[in-house]
């Protein structure tokens, strides 16, 4: 019977049955393998069930652990300051950190975040002023202290450099502006010192009529104007003679300098006139024009025209102007004590334009002209010294409560001393006795007490002192006194034993006082500006860090001409105060 059944089943049917059995076997095998693999896969947390009205209230969560920064846990903490105020600090383990924004005000310290090679670093300093290294023994013909680093003309309390006088006009105690002998002497001494320490300037000559091959073809002479080469007997040289009506375009010379901005020219007018310099600047829009006119106008700004009066100039004179300073003082002109800050810079000196009738020669542009500024200051001191030998300061000065105000016309020992230092150097450079005689006359106010329009004070009825501010009662300002001593030293050394006897005696008496009184200015962590706390019984007038470093620089200088230990020891101790050093306590 089986054989009959097998015979009846077609062989194709057997093939289909075998295929179905094979497929079923494969499917069962894959299912088992997948379930086994799923048991080893990471399981994601199930989403929380949707909240329901009847769900149980949640239990309060435990507080979050402290944040972790750089692997260190920290937490905020209240810091109680002197039982007066509370600020937020940070605790990391046993350390407590307080914000620097609070520390810098509380301790009067300084710091900032700076970046080096792509990473940030916080730089902290106890003070903000630096001490200059004394290069060598001080000499009256050498660098004056650290004045090669001074830039008097850029100070915001300098209104401008006068076109008539060639020296700075100060606004420190009055927005109207006044000539201040200290500022003028510092202007001269800084440029003198720069001349000794800087490389010689690059000078480019644009026109000099003396050269035989010099041609006027570079000049532009519009219709109605003239320009000729003539011989000037007073100068024994050829010059350019020009004539250009005020309503004309003017006779012009292209310059095109993009690197240097000190312009100089020899000039003589026979009528009213002007020399104008066109400047392209970093400011968008038309160029600025600086006009140097034959008036006594100090400075004027109108739109993009800046005007400086340079006086009549009816005899040959050399005009030297710093175009950068003149531009920025003009743009920043204000009616307040401070010149407004500006970022505008000159890019190119385009051309020079003359109007009026006169002669011009030796037009140059240079990197610097330090000696021109030095002699401008020296000559101003000679011209403006009065019959007493002083340089009166024509502005009221109020030093503080308890001191009688100084009315216009007062003298300053610091002004007298720094003027001496300037004039002595001018004499040593030129051998012109005019400068030395003016310096010798400047000792006059040192011999008279403050009550008699002098600068002399006496401490404890014994020690002579020369007052920067000859107040009543005396104030005993330290830095001004030392500057006066340096000036007396310069004069005594230069004038010699006979002519310099008065200066030498004044210097010796002053140095004796300084050595005795210097410890009175030491607080154990800084220095004191004056002795008002002793004279008036008020709080001490602590010296700012820039005055503190001035005291150090002055003592370093004196230490090269007097080897008294008090100068060396004071310098060492006072330098330590700049980095947080303090005198020992009991």
Curated annotation (Swiss-Prot):
Topology Lumenal: residue spans: 30-586
UniProt record similarity statement: Belongs to the D-glucuronyl C5-epimerase family.
Pathway: Glycan metabolism; heparan sulfate biosynthesis; Glycan metabolism; heparin biosynthesis
Keyword DNA repair: no
Mutagenesis / variant outcome for changing residue 180 to F: Moderately reduces catalytic activity
Protein name listed in UniProt: D-glucuronyl C5-epimerase B
Pro residues biased stretches: 59-68
Activity regulation comment: Inhibited by O-sulfated heparin, which is produced by a downstream step in the heparin biosynthesis pathway.
Mutant phenotype after disruption: Double morpholino knockdown of both glcea and glceb results in dorsalized embryos, with reduced ventral tail fin, kinked tail and an enlarged heart cavity. In severe cases there is significant shortening of the body and tail coiling. Epimerase activity is reduced. Expression of the dorsalizing factor chordin is expanded, whereas expression of bmp2b is reduced, notably in the tail. Expression of gata1 in blood islets is also reduced.
Residue positions binding substrate: 150, 155-157, 183, 398-401, 483, 532, 544-550, 568
GO MF terms held by the record: heparosan-N-sulfate-glucuronate 5-epimerase activity; identical protein binding; metal ion binding
Enzyme class, first EC level, given as a word: isomerase
Principal subcellular localisation of the protein: Golgi
Result, substituting residue 544 to A: Significantly reduces catalytic activity
Outcome recorded upon mutating residue 547 to A/F: Abolishes catalytic activity
Ligand binding (Ca(2+)): 208, 210, 237, 361
Protein localization: Golgi apparatus membrane
Annotated consequence of substituting residue 155 to A: Moderately reduces catalytic activity
Known partners and oligomeric status: Homodimer.
Record's keyword annotation contains Membrane: yes
Catalytic reaction equation(s): [heparosan-N-sulfate](n) = [heparan-N-sulfate](n)
Key words, A-Z: Calcium, Golgi apparatus, Isomerase, Membrane, Metal-binding, Signal-anchor, Transmembrane, Transmembrane helix
Membrane topology: Single-pass type II membrane protein
Record GO cellular component, one term: Golgi apparatus
Residue ranges, Cytoplasmic side: 1-8
């Amino acid at each position: 019977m089986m054989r009959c059944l097998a015979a009846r089943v077609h062989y194709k049917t057997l093939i289909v049955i075998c295929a179905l059995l094979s497929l079923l076997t494969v499917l069962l095998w894959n299912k088992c393998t997948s379930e086994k693999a799923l048991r080893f896969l990471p399981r994601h947390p199930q989403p929380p069930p949707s909240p329901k009205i009847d769900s149980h209230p949640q239990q309060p969560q435990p507080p979050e652990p402290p944040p972790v920064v750089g692997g260190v846990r920290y937490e905020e903490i209240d810091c109680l300051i002197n039982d007066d105020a509370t600020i937020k600090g940070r605790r990391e383990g046993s350390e407590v950190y307080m914000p620097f924004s609070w520390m810098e005000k509380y301790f009067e310290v300084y710091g900032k975040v700076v970046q080096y090679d792509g990473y940030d670093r916080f730089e902290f300093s106890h003070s903000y002023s630096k001490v200059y290294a004394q290069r060598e023994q001080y000499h009256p013909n050498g660098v004056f202290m650290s004045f090669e680093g001074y830039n008097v003309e850029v100070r915001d309390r300098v209104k401008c450099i006068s076109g008539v006088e060639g020296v700075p006009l100060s606004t420190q105690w009055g927005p109207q502006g006044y000539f201040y002998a200290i500022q003028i002497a510092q202007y001269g001494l800084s440029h003198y010192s720069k001349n000794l320490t800087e490389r010689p300037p690059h000078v480019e000559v644009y026109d000099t009529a003396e050269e035989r091959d010099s041609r006027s073809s570079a000049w532009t002479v519009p219709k109605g104007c003239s320009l000729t080469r003539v011989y000037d007997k007073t100068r024994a040289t050829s010059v350019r003679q020009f004539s250009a009506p005020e309503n004309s375009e003017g006779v012009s010379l292209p310059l095109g300098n993009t690197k240097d901005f000190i312009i100089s020219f020899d000039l003589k007018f026979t009528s009213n006139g002007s020399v104008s310099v066109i400047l392209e600047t970093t400011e968008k829009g038309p160029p600025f024009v600086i006009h140097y006119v034959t008036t006594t106008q100090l400075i004027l700004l109108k739109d993009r025209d800046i005007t400086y009066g340079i006086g009549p100039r009816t005899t040959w004179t050399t005009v030297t102007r710093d175009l950068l300073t003149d531009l920025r003082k003009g743009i920043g002109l204000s009616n307040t004590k401070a010149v407004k800050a500006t970022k505008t810079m000159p890019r190119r000196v385009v051309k020079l334009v003359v109007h009026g009738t006169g002669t011009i020669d030796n037009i140059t542009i240079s990197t610097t002209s330090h000696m021109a500024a030095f002699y401008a200051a020296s000559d101003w001191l000679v011209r403006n010294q009065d019959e007493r030998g002083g340089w009166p300061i024509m502005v009221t000065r109020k030093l503080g409560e308890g001191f009688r105000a100084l009315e216009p016309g007062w003298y300053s020992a610091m002004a007298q001393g720094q003027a001496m230092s300037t004039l002595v150097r001018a004499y040593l450079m030129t051998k012109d006795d005019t400068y030395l005689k003016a310096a010798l006359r400047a000792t006059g106010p040192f011999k008279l007490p403050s009550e008699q329009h002098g600068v002399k004070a006496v401490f404890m009825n014994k020690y002579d002192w020369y007052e920067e501010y000859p107040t009543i009662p005396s104030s005993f300002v330290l830095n001004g006194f030392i500057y006066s001593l340096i000036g007396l030293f310069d004069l005594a050394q230069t004038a010699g034993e006979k002519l310099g006897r008065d200066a030498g005696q004044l210097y010796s008496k002053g140095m004796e006082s300084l050595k005795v009184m210097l410890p009175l200015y030491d607080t154990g962590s800084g220095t004191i500006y004056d002795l008002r706390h002793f004279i008036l019984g008020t709080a001490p007038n602590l010296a700012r860090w820039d005055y503190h470093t001035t005291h150090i620089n002055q003592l370093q200088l004196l230490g090269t001409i007097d080897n008294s230990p008090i100068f060396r020891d004071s310098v060492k101790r006072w330098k330590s105060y700049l980095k947080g050093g303090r005198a020992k306590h009991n």
